[in-house]
């Protein structure tokens, strides 16, 4: 599929939002969700790349992602299925990645968990994402997040968090993190906070984790102060109540 030039995509989205401005909600923590996507249109049954495609942008008013406030989620480390592998499409927002995640999601839900913590597809030991989000951990005062190894999505919210954290003076390491390292940190008390990052939720705090019969609680099951600060800052920048020195927002 062709790559849409950034200036053309932004111009199109801007005009669409202006056209549909009556649908922009004004209540606290609500938003107009914008989703660009592209589909192949070749009228053929064979398996091959598309020569014709359509670029579409849809918008939809959405309510507060956390209507009752930020609540930490319980996550289950998935060591059977994988969402993507290096050399595949894990670094892209493709529908196939979601399809590969459904069975594990059902299994986690059946065990009382709300999200899946994905491991890599080769060694089945290194953490990659949580649900459909990037993931970060505060361990011994340092921020750790899986590196972009070809099967991890280079999320915009992830990038924004890294920028903010560095500006706040935190050391951020992008590297391989094993599930064993994470659980050892939780068990010895050095895992201070954990959260997912993504467009819809912005920040999703993690309160409990389960893996191979082990169960750990993060920060007493409460939202950490840094997790909350990231959420408040990002949402504040989106709403214009916090300064935006990075030029992340466009005022229409």
Predicted feature locations:
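Helix-start/capping segments and mature chain N-termini
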Residues: 2-3, 8, 12, 16, ...
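Extended, Lys/Arg-enriched charged tracts that mediate electrostatic binding to polyanionic substrates
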Residues: 24-39
């Amino acid at each position: 599929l062709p790559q849409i030039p950034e200036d053309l995509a932004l111009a199109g989205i801007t005009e669409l939002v202006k056209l549909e401005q009556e649908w922009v909600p004004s209540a606290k923590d609500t938003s107009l969700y914008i989703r660009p996507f592209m589909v192949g249109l070749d009228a053929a049954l064979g398996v091959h790349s598309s020569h014709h495609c359509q670029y579409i942008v849809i918008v939809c008013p959405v309510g507060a992602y956390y209507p009752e406030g930020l609540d930490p989620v319980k996550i289950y480390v998935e060591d059977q299925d994988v969402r993507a592998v290096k050399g595949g499409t894990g670094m892209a927002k493709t529908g196939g990645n979601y399809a590969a995640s459904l069975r594990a999601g059902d299994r986690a839900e059946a065990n009382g968990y709300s999200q899946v913590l994905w491991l890599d597809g080769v060694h089945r030991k290194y953490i990659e994402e949580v649900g459909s989000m990037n993931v970060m951990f505060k361990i011994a005062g340092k921020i750790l997040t899986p590196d972009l190894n070809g099967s991890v999505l280079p999320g915009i919210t992830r990038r924004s968090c890294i920028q903010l954290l560095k500006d706040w003076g935190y050391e951020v390491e992008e590297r391989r993190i094993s599930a064993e390292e994470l659980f050892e940190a939780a068990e010895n008390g050095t895992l201070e906070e954990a959260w997912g990052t993504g467009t819809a939720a912005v920040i999703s705090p993690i309160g409990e984790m389960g893996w191979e019969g082990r169960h750990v609680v993060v920060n007493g099951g409460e939202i950490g102060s840094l997790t909350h600060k990231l959420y408040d800052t990002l949402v504040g920048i989106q709403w214009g109540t916090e300064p935006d020195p990075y030029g992340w927002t466009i005022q229409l």
